[in-house]
Design a protein with these regions (language model features):
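Residues at the C-termini of beta-strands that transition into short coil/loop
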Residues: 35, 68, 107, 129, ...
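Rossmann-like NAD(P)(H) cofactor-binding subdomain of soluble oxidoreductases
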Residues: 58-141
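Active-site-adjacent segment of FAD-dependent monooxygenases/related oxidoreductases
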Residues: 54-58, 155
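Short, charged/polar "capping" segments at the starts of alpha-helices
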Residues: 40-43, 113, 160
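NAD(P)+-binding Rossmann beta1-loop-alpha1 motif at the extreme N-terminus of oxidoreductases
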Residues: 1-50
């Protein structure tokens, strides 16, 4: 997984989804943002994602869509949508996942992974948490407040090959990702 061939969908292109997706795409990872906010999606596709703040103000080319059926299969899904939209959002992307697609949630709060597991299966879900911060300034425009680490780990504990591969790939593509032995504990530390 530690190469540019990894295909990543970001489900929920709000402030944090755009931050993660934009940083990864900026260094060449194959990323697609998925969101229902059409004006936002259109602006990103027309002019690129405008990212201000840490790292300097810039435009990042990253494709976005409101119709995930056009994407083809993905290797990983970063879940960043609002909790109230989680179930319908996951159901809307069933056609882009395969038996090896991995899901990781960096949403605030607890319990999201259990919902994701109930829809896609236990073995597909890994835990995640982040200290990154971002906010939306307008359609296609975010503020990146700092370069801070994020953590992933097997939801029930441990660091496996897939955790190490994803952490290494994301870190090599502009998004510091640390493999965590106990990602649930890391969430509570946040």
């Amino acid at each position: 997984m530690n190469n540019k061939d990894l295909k990543v969908a970001v489900l929920g292109a709000g402030a944090m989804g755009c931050l993660f997706g934009g940083l990864l795409a900026e260094k060449g990872l194959n990323v697609m943002l998925i969101d229902v906010w059409k004006e936002h999606v259109d602006e990103i596709n027309k002019n690129g994602l405008k990212m201000d703040g840490h790292g300097g103000d810039r435009f990042i080319k990253v494709p976005a869509t409101s119709d995930p059926s056009s994407m083809g299969k993905v290797d990983a899904v970063i879940v960043m949508c609002k909790a109230t939209a989680l179930e319908p959002a996951l159901k809307s992307i069933k056609n882009i996942i395969n038996d090896k697609t991995v899901f990781m949630s960096f949403q605030n709060g607890i319990g999201h992974e259990a919902i994701i597991k109930s829809i896609v299966g236990d073995e597909k879900v890994i835990g995640g948490t982040t200290t990154q911060a971002s906010n939306i300034l307008g359609p296609g425009h975010i503020m990146n407040h700092a370069a801070l680490p994020s953590w992933i780990g097997e939801y029930d504990g441990g660091i496996t090959d897939r955790i190490t591969e994803i952490a290494d790939t994301f870190t090599a593509h502009n998004l510091e990702m640390i493999a965590a032995e106990d990602v649930k504990k890391r969430k509570w530390m946040k």
